[in-house]
A protein has these predicted regions:
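Glycine-enriched, solvent-exposed interface loops adjoining structured elements
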Residues: 1-197
Length: 197
């Protein structure tokens, strides 16, 4: 069930299940609304960056996909833009140099670049100080556990989720049948011997 739930969530997000992406219709937004969370931090951490303008922040461990992110800067160098919200634009490691040097795509008074550096850490690139980093994201769904598990056995244990107690699907009930159908199909596929195709 857990694998089916994860598959359905990812398919709804990227549009493979319905042909529309997660925020395109009210129906799709409702299916995943229980997984949408907001996180903000003012705690910059140490890190070795790709540029002299790098700032590092931790992000939550339950992130599946970031759907929106912004920063707030009160840097005096911003002039009248001081205290304004700046959008954050993700870039790949390969794109960073040419994007950073492009005056229309690089970081500026309205835009900050983001690199994913692993270990639930992001590198934000801005020549201005960053006072607050905020994200809205789709979180990983908690595993579906149909019965309490025997001692010592856990599924998806985290600091906030014990992983050994009965836990039903927390998603919108309208999507439960789809998750069940995917789970049945996965179970059937796992029992059918491979024909070598």
């Amino acid at each position: 069930m857990t694998k089916a739930q994860e598959s359905v969530v990812i398919s709804l997000y990227n549009g493979n299940l319905t042909g529309d992406s997660f925020e395109k219709t009210e129906e799709l937004r409702r299916y995943l609304s229980d997984l949408v969370k907001t996180y903000s931090t003012t705690d910059e951490i140490d890190g070795e960056g790709r540029t002299e303008d790098s700032h590092f922040f931790h992000i939550p461990e339950d992130i599946l996909f970031i759907t929106y992110e912004s920063v707030l800067s009160n840097d005096d160098k911003l002039g009248c833009a001081k205290g304004s919200i700046m959008e954050v634009v993700p870039v790949t490691q390969d794109e960073l140099h040419k994007t950073k040097e492009n005056p229309f795509r690089g970081s500026n008074k309205r835009r900050v670049l983001r690199l994913d550096v692993g270990d639930y850490t992001v590198e934000l690139i801005s020549s201005f100080s960053i006072d607050k980093y905020q994200i809205r994201y789709l979180s990983k769904p908690e595993p579906i556990i149909l019965i309490d598990l025997p001692d010592g056995l856990t599924i998806g244990k985290t600091d906030t989720f014990p992983g050994d107690k009965e836990n039903m699907c927390k998603l919108n009930p309208a999507i439960h049948r789809t998750i069940l159908e995917v789970a049945v199909n996965l179970a059937i596929k796992s029992r059918v011997p491979s024909t070598g195709k």
